[in-house]
Amino acid sequence: MIQAVTSCFQFKRCTTHLLEFIAADKPMVGDALADPSDEKLAHFVRTTAALKIEYRCAQGPSPRVFELALAQLRALNRIAEWESGWVVYPLYTCARQLVQMAAALDARTERAAEAAQCGDLATEDHLTQCGRAVHMSLNLCLKDRDPAASNKRHGAYYFALLLFRTYARLGAHSLVTNMVKVLESRAQDLPPVERAFGERRALTVTYCYYLGRYHACRRADYEKGFRWLNTALLTCHRDHTRHHQLILTYLVPVAFLARRWYPKHHVIAAWPPPQDPAAIHYAALVAALRSGDLGLYDRELVRMQLPLLRRGLYLPLSHLRPYILLRLVKAVWRLSGGSSQLPIRIIAAALAYSTSATPDAGGERLLDHTECLLANLIARGYVKGYLSHGNRVLVVSRTEPFPRLVRSETAA
């Protein structure tokens, strides 16, 4: 095996022999003591051999196994600095193994801390160390100045993908922001995502999913989030229904906020039954969005508050409220015969009824609150008209009081 591994570095090619040699759970074949002449490669070989032995003795990840896996990645980083693009996938395999070990160890530490009723100060330790090592791999790829097509720059996407996962588990949102800014600043030097991952479609899907989730939930850039999430959905294999559901959990609200697209009925119907209290189900929210039922919307938002906050979806879904209010105002306008003048008190009464509040509660304050909501709709361009505060009347355009903002279907 050692000879096959050294030949990979000699002839600049990635083979299954090298990938199996990197894997801690694969047995060593041959003499590990037959070190190659290159000092860096020899250190990598010895570290990997020690990792395999320790992994077999521990029968899985352990703190010592993690230390050796971390040393393995650092050793391969030093080698990769002078190699071309062929080394990206072996380096990614090594880094992915480290991330998986760190996540498993931190989860085990967290469970032990909960059982002992201790604090959780040490639960991020392995992932934090892991993140620093993987970030070094990312920098290696970004700093590759080789003009040839065989450079390592496409590897930046591979390690960004691992860092997305690592930072998500750590809750390190600022580190995600910094990483995305660096990738965007180097966009001209990097190949397109689809070309970078090649035939590894699963990696393309995961990368697009994380980037779309970041732009939608952390930056409130729904158009950019929609493009990445939609690419993830279209690239995902049609039989991977669980992945489809995970992507659609973000794409359904983002598609509406970005393009004003409702989800198709079969998309909502395909959602699993709502027995799981931690699951996110959109049937009621879509019904509220179509009917202008603010009360139903508020109840659903409260019911799903914790899972929405965990997934970062609370802010995007809270941005749906103006559209539901717009539906309500439009319904009042139709019931009033399509008049160009709508008394504020009628809209306030409909608003109070929809939210199960007492219609006359607050009196003038309720009317003032309703005017503020209507002024917001006018400022956003959702309603063409103006407010007559003295007469407490909403005056709307006779030709097009409510510009068409919503399409009936989505491409999802």
From Swiss-Prot:
The listed locations are: Cytoplasm; Nucleus
Give the organism's phylogenetic lineage: Eukaryota, Fungi, Dikarya, Ascomycota, Saccharomycotina
Provide this UniProt record's keywords sorted from A to Z: Cytoplasm, Nucleus, Signalosome
**Gene3D superfamilies with a match to the protein in the record:** Winged helix-like DNA-binding domain superfamily/Winged helix DNA-binding domain
Any GO CC annotation of this UniProt entry: euchromatin
> Gene encoding this chain?
CSN12
Molecular function in Gene Ontology: double-stranded DNA binding; RNA binding
Function, as annotated, reads: Component of the COP9 signalosome (CSN) complex that acts as an regulator of the ubiquitin (Ubl) conjugation pathway by mediating the deneddylation of the cullin subunit of SCF-type E3 ubiquitin-protein ligase complexes. The CSN complex is involved in the regulation of the mating pheromone response.
Question: Which PROSITE patterns does the UniProt entry name for this protein?
Answer: PCI
Q: Which organism encodes this protein?
A: Eremothecium gossypii (strain ATCC 10895 / CBS 109.51 / FGSC 9923 / NRRL Y-1056)
Q: What is this protein called?
A: COP9 signalosome complex subunit 12
Matching Pfam families: PCI
